[in-house]
Curated annotation (Swiss-Prot):
InterPro entries: Run_dom, Run_dom_sf, RUN_RUSC2, RUSC1_2, SH3-like_dom_sf, SH3_domain. One of its GO terms (molecular function) is small GTPase binding. Changing residue 1158 to A: Loss of interaction with RAB35. It comes from Homo sapiens (Human). Residues 1031-1175 form the RUN domain. PROSITE patterns: RUN, SH3. The gene is RUSC2. Residues 1447-1506 form the SH3 domain. The RUN domain is required for the interaction with RAB1A, RAB1B and RAB35. Residues 206-217 have a biased composition (Gly residues). The keyword Cytoplasm applies. Pfam families: RUN (PF02759), SH3_2 (PF07653). Changing residue 1155 to A: Loss of interaction with RAB35. This is AP-4 complex accessory subunit RUSC2. Its main location: cytoplasm.
Amino acid sequence: MDSPPKLTGETLIVHHIPLVHCQVPDRQCCGGAGGGGGSTRPNPFCPPELGITQPDQDLGQADSLLFSSLHSTPGGTARSIDSTKSRSRDGRGPGAPKRHNPFLLQEGVGEPGLGDLYDDSIGDSATQQSFHLHGTGQPNFHLSSFQLPPSGPRVGRPWGTTRSRAGVVEGQEQEPVMTLDTQQCGTSHCCRPELEAETMELDECGGPGGSGSGGGASDTSGFSFDQEWKLSSDESPRNPGCSGSGDQHCRCSSTSSQSEAADQSMGYVSDSSCNSSDGVLVTFSTLYNKMHGTPRANLNSAPQSCSDSSFCSHSDPGAFYLDLQPSPFESKMSYESHHPESGGREGGYGCPHASSPELDANCNSYRPHCEPCPAVADLTACFQSQARLVVATQNYYKLVTCDLSSQSSPSPAGSSITSCSEEHTKISPPPGPGPDPGPSQPSEYYLFQKPEVQPEEQEAVSSSTQAAAAVGPTVLEGQVYTNTSPPNLSTGRQRSRSYDRSLQRSPPVRLGSLERMLSCPVRLSEGPAAMAGPGSPPRRVTSFAELAKGRKKTGGSGSPPLRVSVGDSSQEFSPIQEAQQDRGAPLDEGTCCSHSLPPMPLGPGMDLLGPDPSPPWSTQVCQGPHSSEMPPAGLRATGQGPLAQLMDPGPALPGSPANSHTQRDARARADGGGTESRPVLRYSKEQRPTTLPIQPFVFQHHFPKQLAKARALHSLSQLYSLSGCSRTQQPAPLAAPAAQVSVPAPSGEPQASTPRATGRGARKAGSEPETSRPSPLGSYSPIRSVGPFGPSTDSSASTSCSPPPEQPTATESLPPWSHSCPSAVRPATSQQPQKEDQKILTLTEYRLHGTGSLPPLGSWRSGLSRAESLARGGGEGSMATRPSNANHLSPQALKWREYRRKNPLGPPGLSGSLDRRSQEARLARRNPIFEFPGSLSAASHLNCRLNGQAVKPLPLTCPDFQDPFSLTEKPPAEFCLSPDGSSEAISIDLLQKKGLVKAVNIAVDLIVAHFGTSRDPGVKAKLGNSSVSPNVGHLVLKYLCPAVRAVLEDGLKAFVLDVIIGQRKNMPWSVVEASTQLGPSTKVLHGLYNKVSQFPELTSHTMRFNAFILGLLNIRSLEFWFNHLYNHEDIIQTHYQPWGFLSAAHTVCPGLFEELLLLLQPLALLPFSLDLLFQHRLLQSGQQQRQHKELLRVSQDLLLSAHSTLQLARARGQEGPGDVDRAAQGERVKGVGASEGGEEEEEEEETEEVAEAAGGSGRARWARGGQAGWWYQLMQSSQVYIDGSIEGSRFPRGSSNSSSEKKKGAGGGGPPQAPPPREGVVEGAEACPASEEALGRERGWPFWMGSPPDSVLAELRRSREREGPAASPAENEEGASEPSPGGIKWGHLFGSRKAQREARPTNRLPSDWLSLDKSMFQLVAQTVGSRREPEPKESLQEPHSPALPSSPPCEVQALCHHLATGPGQLSFHKGDILRVLGRAGGDWLRCSRGPDSGLVPLAYVTLTPTPSPTPGSSQN
């Protein structure tokens, strides 16, 4: 911790500098170990850095190699060149540092951080370039190079697999890797810089392969990093293979690279202090300067630096976790553990890692710089950094505050690292020897503290530590990891791990930052601990985790937020996720996972790096499931996917799980999620928004959209929530490591199992991990990283949570990183969408989409536990919604956190699965649905509130994996701090809610407009009196009541619990009942309720509800009642779902409710005097009208029966229905107007008047146009069709103008059309719509509530105006013939008697209407025309004969536009005159329209009075 004291708080921030240098050294350490001691680490998957069989030796080798590579190794030179190439790839020339850390005062050109690190570590000015590591001699690349050959064989998946077991195989495969590295050093080292960086990135992005097969994959990547890079994108399987050793090697670099590249290009500026704030920048600059001076020394310990870098790399290119722990080995090991993952990743993705630095806690984003390719690494770092920057920027201040204040002087980087370290520290206390170190990640955490002891502690890390120690234990020791990535990122500023973590928190998707932060601490400690995910972090824990603890305990003003943001951000999202998201395209495959998972790779790293013990289970974990069992790609996809999902380190699938767990454990611990985390009330610190004040800064980083999206957490609370969430998720992984730490050996085995679960389990959990994320910590973080990120990355917050199931496949389609760090790694593809999604879901964005898919669950989970990383369990859901909750964890929150640690939300395999058994048990224990809703609910509530849009879909989509994740996100009810916390994730459609308010707005506008017709108070009083002005009643009933009812029905539960009957149906009236219980302020409401309830006339709940609204308007209390209801949350909770309008009014859309109240206010100023039984009276009057109409019809039938034939003939032939039409038109227009007029009462009145006119003065009416009455009745009887029939109701000849087309049957003017004898025009008037006719007939206008639909009314008016004159006469005639209500209607026309008419079936099917053939209709027409009584009788006898005695020219007019929908049908336009060729059975007529002929529906045509003088109008 020599360096840490130096950099205390400042270093932390500075360490956000790209981890490239650090990672490079670490990688180089691996490379050195693998390359220098090539024979030592031939292990293909065993990235020399990570898979160090001989902890001390390997570490030393790694360090030495790292430095030598950085400075002098051929690989170094190649790397320098490759670095340049890589940079070029990244769009940065050798001279264009990916991340020029503004704070790197060193001449390190664009990449002072790396150069400085290396210069400091190596003391080689030549290494000055920030990418000097890459350029000078990047042992990491070397390592990759060495590893390349194995990768060659194992290229692709095998390495991915290897990578997964990087930690496991680290020791075993270290030699092969070293050999490979050595081999590759010459050949591939040249290409390696690029490839390596890319591979790193890929590894980081690519999950299992990159991380798990760190040794082999990295090797391959080292060998042909360029190819690998290509492979990364083209050959996912191969990249993972490539990822083996090189991956691990590159892991740090890769992590750094990816994160860095991503950050660099996207938002490294943000990542560094540069983007944080001026103050932070200054601090970072100061830190960096300090670090550059002394930190140079620290950097000089390249292995340590690299380790730190790998941790930091995960965070951001610019974010260099100043791992103040003086254990170079640890940092190295951590680095290597990260590195193996990184290497695996790198291998998996050739160069992709370069694009997005690994997400090792902070090293993640730096590793690319260190490793394969300065350019690629830079790119990776830039991408990652950018992605992270988005997250980190938002959390940056947060981290800075925490880092600077919380981070004790010993570990400034610790602040970022401390975030991680804190987690680690919590885990650190039990830095168990092998797997345990994983759990006690914190012990592993001190990058600079115990190089060799740590290696022992971290069996997996031990290899890495050995490499680190061997290479530069001395150098590393006492060196602060000032992983100041050169300004590879756009900003090239140095970020603290805390910042990274914060970043990752904010964009949960960005595992990169989190990974970086965690990666630095975790990775460094995760070489051995990688297997025991916790083990790696524990090392750092000493330096950072403990600091974090102390900080937390102390007050953690700086630290808690730091940890919250750093832990979550760095571990969960920022480093890997960011990088991966940013690096989306390049890191498609394992790289992203690796990137995202670097912390997790700690587990794999431990596996890979861990001593043989570590390697065994590491192999088991990484190698067995990933390397061996699964094809590198598949395994990597599977393992890494889950791991990646769990932890960006996922690239080293097996290791990744461990890493994920380690990282997670560290995070969990830091978050209070870890076992140790529990002891340390980390949540208190996390809850404590130490950096929250800074969080409000939402930096719009200039990284591409992806990054911005990932970091699109806008508010401080959101940011905090994200970081908390990140931490929350991290805690799960960390908790798993913690658990494993508890069971180091078992953990090792479980971790092996876990990696296996991650690998195999990933494959198998591929399907299951997502849904069942058993591993509490591992699963939690990974899910958050992998699932959401992967899916989110993949689908940009879609429920790509299922990637775990699809992981083997998804790894290629959705590279493992896509799961673990998809968001960060795949930023290009996924992050942008995520960003968009986040834009859509502001809260959702941070909650669900924080950085990508993972953020949904992770970020959002973070939101849940953002303040409650520690108390994630209890306060998680609640925290998500309430930052304050995040600040203080209740015992419940603690319980929940512990619970969550034990039962992570992540997929079982996906989670680091440090403890597979615990994972499975947790899976069994966890009720995904039960758990998820709480966290998600809080988060979703938060999201809903912030975003209010489709929040629910996001939670489910964004949740890391699938609904299962979302469901599991919710803490158990017992852990819920509040009902909100326990509520399930809700999706609130703000548009729909706005629609509800809009409906009320329209109703109020109409009512106000009604009253606005006059300013006279007296007139207004009348306008408000429903008795005087029924229109007001109609407006209220037709618009306001439905609108209010819709508001009350929105989200209304189907049932409410009832003491007596258990449950009863819930309805708006139930809400009214509950809200009007007698009380001091509800006496009036209660009285109104009682009054309405006592009306026997109000027979339905709807009628009672409408009456209640009318009463509220009368007492001007509608707004008051709504406000009263709103204030009674108990009523709302009882009756409404969380997504209901009234429920959402308390959470997501309070503004809409305020708007609703404002809209209702004007109603309290209007003088309403509404009859509470207005609706009832309307209905009653409608019935009366119908009855009256029926009576009128009967009487008129009798009156007209004698004259019907004569008048029909006259109207048809002689008078030319003009006169009758006119007379009738007046009548009919009046009637139609009434009916059309639209309002029930008015229509009723008009109807009554018309009816009276027609019926009462039958003969007078005859005088007016005797049939006008009939027409009117007909119109009313078939009001529904009036509009259509108005046009076609003028059948001069058939006179049976079925007023509607539907009545066409009745008005079978044309013989073909001749409707069946209209048994009752009213009843059977409509050919097709007989039922409508019947309804119209039965209910009359009242059926329409006084008015037909607006469209109908408008059409009626139009048609009335156009056809009124012509139609009226025809209809009058028709009326005469049709009016008889019964089947005798036609009979009436022919003199039939009422009895006959009654005898006729009232409802005759349209098919029966035309039972008579055309000849029969003609006969009837002749009979009618000649006034032959016998014929009429016949027609009477044959109800069908009543077919209008249509004139020979049987023509019908189309009442509407019709497109033939079947063969043989005829298309026509409204008003077209169709010649009837004959009846076609059923409701069809065969008609011809010009040259075309076909079937025409009876209902669509009406008889056309050919002779009629007004055929034109009738045609209209």
